[in-house]
Amino acid sequence: DITAIEQLKKLDGPIIILSHQGLAEQWSIDNAKEIQEILKSHQDKIIMTLNGHNHIDHIIKIGSIINFHINSASYKWVGGDHRHKSYSDTIHSKFPYIEYTCPYKDPLYTTVTINPSSKNIEIKGIMSEWVGKSPAQIGQEIHPGLSDGKEVCPHIRTRRVKRS
């Protein structure tokens, strides 16, 4: 979007970019490399990007920009090839799309704190567990570079991320 690029040029910072789909690495937008080149030229004022489309707990740094893939509040989508039952037949008949997910027992959420002077980031974690089987247990392949139980998991890890 040309307007967003123009805004990047005008703003002094600090900037946090929120998007539904990721701007870096696993399952990112189609033109992620092009977007990363634009963002890299403004990395002195961009603290982080934050997205949740992938339902993973993952951080990747590109230059000094922290790209945080935040986990979903309630489940990991596994799709039609991995349909299964995590709850009773009554629940599944009332909510038919739940069979396409690996749900979490408890909702996930986090607090992200940014130090205004250092621009370092602190992420407060929260743990849950799978209701039924995990994506790995039902045979869903994990994207290269991600680990079952680490990035593909029912939690958000506590982290302190230093901006370089």
Q: Residue locations for each model-derived region?
A:
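Binuclear metal-dependent phosphoesterase catalytic core
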Residues: 58-164
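His/acidic metal-ligating clusters that form di-metal
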Residues: 1-67, 155
